[in-house]
Amino acid sequence: PGTVIISAAGNCNNINQVVEPVLQKDGGEIYYINLSKDGHKLGGSSFAQILNGIGDEAPSVLDAGYFKTVFNTLQKLIKDGQLLAGHDVASGGLITTLLELCFADNDLGANLDLSSLNEQDTIKLLFSENIGVVFQAKDDSAENELKASGIEFAKIGSPSSESTLKIKNNGIEIGLNIASLRDTWFKTSYLLDNKQTANGLAKNRFDNYKNQQLNYIFPENFDGQLSPRAQSRGNDRPKAAILREKGSNSEREMANAMYLAGFDVKDVHMTDLITGRETLEDIQFIGAVGGFSNSDVLGSAKGWAGAFKYNEKANKALQDFFARPDTLSVGICNGCQLFMELDLINPEHGTHGRMTYNDSHKHESGFTSVKIQKNDSVMLSTLEGATLGVWISHGEGKFELPLSEKEYNIVAKYGYDAYPANPNGSSYNTAMMTDKTGRHLVTMPHIERSIFQWNWANYPKGRKDEVSPWIEAFENARKWIEKH
């Protein structure tokens, strides 16, 4: 039979004005709003499901107009910077929301009194799935806006620096250990992960997820502002080119990073090189992009590399480019695999390193950190000593390096050498390398997808940066070219 499908989308006016589902230890009070205006009913809830039941009554939204008013008022409070954290009440009920607000940090809990919600049955109160919201306000001034809009709310408690969720309700007191329940919460993901992940690494993820904290060290002189060159429209921009193949992606992110750093960026497809329409003779900086060129048939970047090796014009254009002393390149993800497959990073080695399958034997996608080593890389020189967050997304991201570490110019390593922070098991914990001149960089982490503060899954609290430190890699390339 025909099926009616109704889709809805919500517009986010400003992605820089959002609240995250994690309480701020130094923030204000915690509030609850029941958007449903219905009683606390357990029908259709996760609680009913684990008891092998369905229930008789499920909560509904009794007043659509009130729901709209609450939503719009909360949007205004977010826009005005009055809310520090927030989480909807949905699957699992209020207790799940409260716990999840504490899971994403260490030494974080809350002291709560739910008696003002006027529900004697604590089980119903905690596990009913009435649509609602829990939020943390910057200060008490948010209450004035809520009252002015006729919204019923309850101040239910405050955050704490103890890893315990303490709940009171009409004489009942409950203390819940955050770390223990976070493991319980994560266990379902672990059980599914264990069916997909090789070499017992699902257990490593389960053991390490709470230990591999994202700790950053930003460059001392980084101010978070775009270079004036980003706004220039003159003809003095050095020329850069994006290299891509069928199945490539991230070319727009790479082009944008180059442009913001001051480059005039050209799009170059493999057909341009194969036919001779493009020779790269007027290009000083190339970026081979990420993705799944040729659908990874025969392996990542194998087909792309073959297109260079077995097409005379394309091969000559690339070899001539790398032979010039005034050029730079960056290969990111699939582009890294391409340059490694073509032996462009360590051509002097008799036995070459290669990219191979992740130790997990599956595609890895996540947000991790890298430590920039002491280096002579053109692109990363000013980032030496920094530890930065970055996205990874690859199935064959393992640097398999047959020689001793001193034979390679490893310029960045993952923040931790264990899985999942090191997502692939690379030799020497390698995340990025350059050739011996420092001019040609290969990186499995996607620095071009991590250019903006809002790109990062986690960013240092309190910073209001236009761009992240990764923009310096591209700016350094432009400055070097202007001198050469």
Please name every model-derived segment:
Residues 156, 276-278, 319-320, 352-484:
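Amide-donor transfer/coupling interface in amidating biosynthetic enzymes
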Residues 152, 326-328, 439:
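Proline-centered loop/turn at the N-terminus of a beta-strand
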Residues 22-26, 39-40, 76-79, 124-129, ...:
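Solvent-exposed alpha-helices and their adjacent loops that cap or buttress functional pockets
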Residues 169-332, 336-349, 356-364, 371, ...:
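N-terminal beta1-alpha1 cap of cysteine-dependent amidohydrolase-like domains
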Residues 15-18, 33, 39-45, 95-98, ...:
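Short helix/loop capping segments that flank catalytic or ligand/cofactor-binding pockets
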Residues 1-7, 11-127, 140-239, 247:
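Intein/HINT protein-splicing elements and their conserved insertion hotspots or analogous self-processing inserts
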Residues 129-138:
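Short cationic amphipathic helices and targeting signals
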